[in-house]
Regions:
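Metallocarboxypeptidase
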Residues: 80, 85-282
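Residue-level detector of functionally pivotal "anchor" positions at catalytic/ligand-binding pockets or at interdomain
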Residues: 268-280, 372-383, 415-416, 533-555, ...
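Intrinsically disordered, low-complexity Pro/Gly/Ser/Thr-rich segments with frequent PxxP/GP/PP motifs
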Residues: 313-342
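Terminal connector regions
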Residues: 337-372
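Extracellular glycan-recognition surfaces and repeat-rich motifs
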Residues: 375-419, 468-494
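Extracellular beta-strand-rich recognition modules
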Residues: 380, 429-444, 452, 456, ...
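Extracellular carbohydrate recognition
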Residues: 449-451, 516-535
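C-terminal outer-membrane/trafficking sorting elements
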Residues: 545-555, 559-632
Length: 632
């Protein structure tokens, strides 16, 4: 038979360094050449960008990356011989069997649970899934075995086609491994880039014994177990031999997942933060969660803040995670302080950075100083504030009863959907210095292909600008490439916030829009408890100064059954309006009083215990805004 070739990409490929090793293979099955093609594409991408891309440079300098582009050269060449223009359907190698048939399925010839039953492989030589006369009977798989035991990989990717899935053990039984959470977490992250489904091979496709993934994970004697995956590239229409115009697209789909796979095999952590956009104290914190995904043990990760605004006077010390456990979420925070000269509505920017000895990743956080007040709230119990011929209320899924608003109130969204919902009201931000759109959301769409966007328009809907929130992500869909979208699956309500400060000084409308393709239809997007909060330009004092210039004395605070409000200074307004909101901007109580009254009494008996905000308006001007605690 023909030789198998392997390639090593590293900063010193001729040396065996004490670095993490990852293996990519392809073409176990001769009619699945897209696996080899994407591998060659990725190898060229690494080499061509080594000198110009610091991330790729560091990746290659700190990892030994191995490639075996063609595990089955005899079968591949046979297809080339009989179908030189592509399309050959030979699957196995070219062993001559005792019954004069040809071929062994190389992905049924590995030693772990070889021949476990006749469902996951076949004892019949003429079968497409013939496992061979014995485990490791085939020279190709013997070479793979010896190669793997020589280099001791901790992560392996065996590329196949097709079904747009990412498979992992077990294949030989319909069960999961003891370390299924690791496989599942890795697969979830890896498929963010290409929208593939994922799961154990036996549950996603069919039983398969004597396969590569099971052996790498559990069958290597005197070796560390390797987390092994099988990406199945392409959909049913693209098949084993995708058309020429599809090849580059399929190769590009795998690049980011391959990068992440290399990081998983080495050192890799992530930080997430969902801090509220508004803050009101001169001393504050940036809170975050850290999780380690990289398989390398004994690594220290550092999280730090760097001020990017002159209004930030200081930041706290970095936080170190020394030898964190794999996939355990750690919560922490770092303090920062702002100048006493900061004014309500002022924005600050802080760089949040995660680094280890190899890699650095940073995100810029934008925060707004001050206590906002809502100019619009909607509990989404009716469609009164919205215009749409498709979206509507749903009384089964909601953040707060009795309902939410969704793109498909009954069932899943349709194929080729292009639906939207627009606010009937035009929101006036002409006097706002800062503004934030807040809502609760959950969603379930086909990743990459179907998505939801939130838009703003300042010209009555003639033109729309896509808005970026804390939970949106850049799209990889060519229709809206790199635009912020909500895609994939998030089945827990999250409090989304979108900074609308770029639109202050104008009036705007808000729109939610969903688009889908012709294939998979899912439940869609829900939103609930939406509000638009602003800090007014006329608010000329900071929250800390406000306490020294109060126009009204509010007592008691915390309050029980009643709240009393007494003017501290005379004013000329004819009437006073008292409004009480919860922390999400929902209006719970509004009451008006003549300005001549010496004490205003507000009944709180019907308000549940909790944290609220009280707004006092004298005439048309908001003169006081305070936090209120109600405790029955």
């Amino acid at each position: 038979g023909r030789q198998l070739f392997w390639v090593k990409i590293s900063d010193h490929p001729e040396m065996d360094e004490s670095e993490n090793r990852i293996l990519f293979t392809a073409l176990h099955h001769a009619r699945e050449p897209i696996g080899m093609q994407q591998m060659l594409f990725f190898m060229y991408y690494l080499l061509e960008n080594y000198d110009s891309n610091p991330y790729i440079h560091q990746l290659i300098d700190t990892t030994e990356i191995f490639f075996i582009p063609c595990v089955n050269p005899d079968g591949y060449e046979f297809n080339h011989l009989v179908s030189p223009n592509g399309g050959g359907m030979w699957r196995k190698n070219r062993r001559l069997n005792p019954d004069n048939s040809y071929g062994v399925d190389l992905n049924r010839n590995y030693g772990y649970m070889w021949g476990y039953d006749d469902l996951g492989s076949s004892p019949v030589p003429s079968s497409e899934t013939y496992r061979g006369p014995s485990a490791f009977s085939e020279p190709e798989i013997q070479m793979i075995r010896d190669f793997a035991q020589l280099y001791d990989f901790n992560l392996v990717f065996n590329y196949h086609a097709y079904s747009n899935t990412l498979l992992y053990p077990w294949g030989y039984i319909t069960d999961t491994t003891a370390e299924n959470p690791i496989f599942k977490n890795f697969a979830f992250k890896l498929t963010n880039y290409n929208a593939n489904a994922y799961g154990p091979a036996s549950l996603m496709l069919y039983l398969v014994n004597g396969n590569s993934d099971d052996w790498y994970y559990a069958g290597q004697v005197n070796q560390q177990r390797a987390f092994s995956f099988t990406p199945e590239i392409g959909n049913n229409m693209q098949g084993f031999w995708p058309s020429i115009d599809q090849i580059i697209l399929l190769c590009q789909d795998q690049v980011e997942a391959n990068f992440l796979a290399i990081r998983f095999g080495s050192r890799y952590g992530e930080i997430t933060q969902h801090n509220k956009l508004f803050f009101s104290q001169n001393q504050n914190f940036v809170s975050f969660h850290f999780k380690r995904y990289g398989l390398e043990e004994g690594v220290t990760y550092k999280v730090s803040l760097l001020p990017l605004s002159n209004l930030i006077e200081s930041v706290g010390q970095p936080v170190y995670f020394n030898h964190p456990e794999l996939l355990i979420s750690y919560s922490d925070s770092i303090s920062f302080s702002v100048s006493k000269d900061i004014l309500p509505g002022d924005e600050i920017k802080i760089l949040l950075t995660l680094e280890d000895d190899y890699f650095t990743h940073s995100d810029t956080l934008t925060l707004i100083f001050g206590i906002p007040y809502p100019i619009f709230t909607d509990e989404c119990t009716t469609m009164g504030n919205w215009s749409s011929n498709k979206w509507g209320n749903n009384s089964f899924v909601y953040n707060s009863p009795p309902s939410s608003i969704t793109d498909s109130p009954v069932g899943n969204y349709s194929s080729n959907a292009n639906t939207s919902i627009t606010s009937t009201q035009e929101f006036d931000l002409t006097k706002a210095k800062a503004a934030v759109l807040s809502f609760y959301a959950l969603w379930d769409t086909e990743r990459r292909y179907d998505f939801v966007q939130v838009f703003a328009s300042i010209d009555q809907g003639q033109h729309w600008t896509a808005l970026q929130g804390k939970y949106s992500s850049p799209s990889s869909n060519p229709l809206v490439m790199d635009q912020p979208v909500y895609q994939g699956t998030n089945l827990q309500w999250v409090n989304e916030e979108i900074n609308l400060s770029p639109f202050t000084g104008q009036k705007l409308k808000i729109k939610f829009a969903l688009k889908s393709n012709q294939f998979i239809n899912k439940d869609g997007f829900y939103f609930d408890d939406i509000s638009l909060q602003i800090i007014d330009k006329s608010t000329g004092i900071t929250p800390s100064e406000q306490n020294n210039q109060l126009l009204y004395t509010i007592f008691p605070n915390p309050a029980n059954g009643a709240l009393h409000i007494r003017p501290a200074n005379p004013h000329t307004a004819q009437s006073v309006q008292v409004s009480i909101y919860n922390i999400f901007g929902k209006l719970f109580l509004r009451q008006s009083f003549p300005s001549s009254i010496r004490r205003m009494d507000v009944n709180l008996e019907n308000l549940p215990s909790g944290v609220y905000f009280i707004s006092i308006e004298a005439g048309v001007e908001q003169v006081q805004w305070e936090k209120l605690l109600i405790s029955h």
